[in-house]
Amino acid sequence: MFHSLVLMACALAALSVAQGAGSARSKSLPLSLSLSVSVSSSLASASSPGAAADPTAAFTVTATAPTPASAPFAGKQLNRCRQSCYQQLSKDWHYCKDSVDCTNCCQKLVAPFELRILKAQRQESLVLTDIGWDEMIANASRQCLITWEVSGGGLIGNLLTDTARAELSLWPDTVYNIQVKCKHKLTGLMRRSIKLNVDTSQLVGTTTTTTTSKSSIQRQHLEQPVDHTDALEHSQHIRIPRPTDRVYIISALPTPSELGGVVYPAFGALAFFLALLVMFLFLRPQRKRFPLDADSADTATLIGRSSSSSRNSMDASTLHV
């Protein structure tokens, strides 16, 4: 009798564990409590009918029952939750409600990300600024749209990229608001960055200070006395560029792109004009000479007839005399 009760209790406990793994925690907890109380009461009645049930056994059973259900949740269901972080209204979203780690992961994935300035340098009348963001965001996105606009409204620029950095050409002494929007590959949802305020006057100031410090250090090194024995070594390491006439002549000449933009259209216009001239000369309508020849023939016949009539009149006059 005792062995049969023990087997029934084990079967009921296994059934409660299976039901607790498939259902929610709120439903599995009271079921395990009721089963543990019934198991403990049956064991106590079988061993000693007059003794009361030990409450510690019931609590130990309830503490160990939900542990097998939490192990699979940390594996498959957590992965499902992370896959559906972007789809908050999908069917699998209820997996994220019971895990603190998963909800934190989802909040990080949906929250706006930060931008950082990698490099800035002055080139002629522009400030070339490199900005970057997290590479994981760029890898998980199809494309990222960078938008920069002048603070207060005005000039707006856009740039598409599939990497985690971009180079922007900004005006000096201007404040810009820069923002990046990335589209996820699987879900198609847009994720935005925090707006980055960039003052190009401060960026150029930092770059110029660094360059002046470097130039001053180079001048100090050049002003130091150098021994004649080490003159060859220093000449190999330090080479000061000196401009020549050839450099100035080459810099004064136009670039190939500028030259092509002027010469090629001129040659094209000249060739088009020559083609029109040839077409006009060879395809113009020719004058008809046949009517002119007929008129000349008629005039010739008239002249011949008049001359013959004059001769006949002269012959007649001589005969009459």
Swiss-Prot record:
GO biological process, one term: motor neuron axon guidance
Membrane topology per record: Single-pass type I membrane protein
Sequence intervals crossing the membrane: 262-282
Sequence ranges on the Extracellular membrane side: 19-261
Phenotype caused by lack of the gene: Homozygotes are viable and fertile, display no obvious abnormalities in the development of the CNS, PNS or muscles. However, they exhibit highly specific defects in the innervation pattern of muscle 12, but no obvious defects in the innervation of other muscles. Both loss and gain of function mutants display altered neuromuscular specificity.
Compartment(s) where it occurs, according to its Swiss-Prot or TrEMBL record: Membrane
Any one GO CC term of the record: membrane
UniProt keyword terms in alphabetical order: Membrane, Signal, Transmembrane, Transmembrane helix
Signal peptide positions (record): 1-18
Protein name from the UniProt record: Transmembrane protein fend
